[in-house]
Amino acid sequence: MAGGIEITFEPLSSRGTGGDLVVFVGDDLALSGAASEALGQPGTELVARAAASERFKGKAQSALVLPAPAGVEADRLVVIGLGSEKDRAKIDWTVLGGFTAGKVGARSARVVIDGPGFAASARDVADFTLGARLRSYRFDQYKTKKKDEDEAGAALTLRVADPSGAQAAARSAEAVAEGVILARNLVNEPPNVLYPEEYARRVSELTQLGVEVEILDVARMKEIGMGALLAVAQGSAREPRVVIMRWNGADDAAEPPLALIGKGVVFDSGGVSIKSAGGMEDMKGDMGGSAAVVGTLHALASRKAKANVIGAIGIVENMPDGAAYRPSDIVTSLSGQTIEVINTDAEGRLVLADVLWHIQATYKPKAMIDLATLTGAIIVALGQDIAGLFSNDDALSGQITAAGEAAGEKVWRMPLIPAFDKAIDSKFADMKNTGGRHGGAATAAAFLKRYVNDVPWAHLDIAGVGMSSTPSEINRSWGAGWGVRLLDRLVREHYER
């Protein structure tokens, strides 16, 4: 596995030899002063001639790659288009960093972060480094034969107006990148490696960053009454775990925390209601919500966020055997509410129900957000580029939506109306675990809502974005690590003091 790229900073006036030289232009193909100086007359003239012959127009996210001419201290010239003046006024620096890293590949490059019509702040440069790091990620540790380019590590030297300021700002971006990479690694791991006990052990390594970690084993879960989660786990040879992570970064240690809760089904066969064979291999990623929570706690602790945040994940494997729970079983959750099992493949909500209730009752959080690859229905509704948001609180919903927009992890709020709640009423128990064919994402959210009292709460259904998502300029990984950037932005803007 890798996020293999080395990034350093130097002044715009620096000079160097070898590798790629990257400059930016708008749709008028004008070069900045720093870019012109770096290219020199031979490079400037070559770019102009090549642009005309190649019909390169400098459109946003376009590139022209040329062998460097004599007199230019580089192996290749990479000219990246930024588009019109309007485009340059709203550059997504994270995407630009990923696009640039993609064009450079496993090579060394000097990137002149200066161009016509824009001035890059230290924050912009930090976002650029975040995108470059995320684009360079690979998960290849199980490949015994690798291509030469897979073995090489890229190195970017960013020429900027304020190297020290950019480097300081980049430390925070580096923390976020590490959190996303951790989440991707967890999602990409095979389930024979990342079983519940091993997952819990890996999470316990967060203590090295100052995170307090508590692991609940089966005996403890039975003692407190986590009957819903334990029912899901009883068909597996692997015992479940609940892991609680506490980051106390606020000046006031007694300030109520924000709680982040993740579904951690490390493999979901469907249980007795077994899934079809096609695509079942993807069900190692049914713990993407928990990975986002772990990655976020890693990011917050790494950058010493001034906030109190609790992360909690329920880690189980949903398997069929003679001890597995069955359709028509009735289980008692930690809240005391009873659940009729209609479909054992609707297991994630049972896991979340007990964890939500435990965190709410024990830690009295100011808000709770759960993340789960919960339903195929949300993929039908929203596709694989946007997550579904359900919430009982307009203010929290608005904050999450804005944070997702700013971070590049978009959400769309979905309705929670009484009809969805009524759909999960049961003849034999307090509720059933599915609400029928229609509105599956909404009835799943309505189920979770029954385990939330008066606390502001949001549910993010990330089934479409958490795994096998659409490739982008900052992600070529099967496991996207989706949610870490959104949650980090949310904490930064609304919970840090």
Swiss-Prot record:
Q: State the protein's name.
A: Probable cytosol aminopeptidase
Cofactors demanded by this protein: Mn(2+)
Locations listed in the record: Cytoplasm
Q: Name one GO biological process term.
A: proteolysis
Residues the entry annotates as binding Mn(2+) 2? 263, 268, 286, 347
Q: Where is the active site?
A: 275, 349
Which UniProt keywords are listed?
Answer: Aminopeptidase, Cytoplasm, Hydrolase, Manganese, Metal-binding, Protease
Residue sites binding Mn(2+) 1 per the record:
268, 345, 347
Enzyme class (EC, first level): hydrolase
Broad class of the protein's primary localization:
cytoplasm
- Per the UniProt record, the source organism is Methylorubrum extorquens (strain CM4 / NCIMB 13688)
The keyword Thylakoid belongs to this UniProt entry's keyword annotation = no
Superkingdom in the source lineage = Bacteria
Q: Which reaction does it catalyse?
A: Release of an N-terminal amino acid, Xaa-|-Yaa-, in which Xaa is preferably Leu, but may be other amino acids including Pro although not Arg or Lys, and Yaa may be Pro. Amino acid amides and methyl esters are also readily hydrolyzed, but rates on arylamides are exceedingly low; Release of an N-terminal amino acid, preferentially leucine, but not glutamic or aspartic acids
Q: What is its EC number?
A: 3.4.11.1, 3.4.11.10
Listed under GO cellular component are: cytoplasm
Family statement drawn from the similarity comment of this UniProt entry: Belongs to the peptidase M17 family.
The GO terms describing molecular function are:
manganese ion binding; metalloaminopeptidase activity
Please share the entry's free-text remark on the cofactor: Binds 2 manganese ions per subunit.
Question: Which Cys residues form disulphide pairs?
Answer: none
Q: Would the keyword Lipid metabolism turn up in this protein's UniProt record?
A: no
